[in-house]
Amino acid sequence: MLDKQVTITTGTLITLIRRRGGEPHTILSETPTWYDEGAQRAEDERTNEELASQGLFGPRGLHPGFKATLEAISRPALEYYGWVDGGFEGKALSFTVLAGSAGGEGFVLARHSEHDGVALASVRPEELLTEFLDQIPKLAPGRGRPVAVPKSQVETSRSSSTAQDEGFEVLRSGRQSAGSQEADELRRILSLRRLGSGSLYVAARGRSGARQRIERPVNYIDTTEGRWLTEEIPGSGEPRIAFTPADQQVLGERLRSAQGRLFAS
């Protein structure tokens, strides 16, 4: 277990994961990188020098607490992760975050999308979800009540995995329907200035060691009127697109519920 937060380059963390036979998490490396023998030797030397400068590597090898945390990062038994767009101290900020645990070790790490650095800290495994949610910028729930609109009234264009780019658009109709007021409210929410968004996942390993991830992320959007959970709700008939005022508690409840369905079949 680490006794303090450390910041290392993304390349160094990826090298350390691969030394342990693991595969870098998708939030760290979306494109695999391969080195020839000479390049790999140089990368190993650079990694050791960087760690030594922070007191994490010495004549006896890796710092014991850091080594234990790396084992959990390389093969977490439980993980929460996501892509977040938001702001910090008035500035736009996009980053990825991963919290995981294995073998009694817990960790949380964040990677800024535009900078080559990963901030890493140890956490108590039983507080994993709370620590994960604490990395997400806080915002009050959206002002209003939950709204749900039949999917046929919604045009969806997904150009990326984040909620910010989902592009929900309610189709207008000259014919009034029972759900027209909710459609108008959903349209109003979508017209609000966007402050940020997020797509959050949970994954776990079963007894066989196989990893399973939830099929759909927990998505939210941040507007000038607060945060809204956005989700598609299946039913016996047509699915509905639902927007629900959300805070950290609501996001946590959705992630716990999704986690409970892993390996259910």
Locate the predicted segments by residue.
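Short, surface-exposed polybasic-aromatic patches that bind anionic ligands, especially phosphate groups
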Residues: 2-265
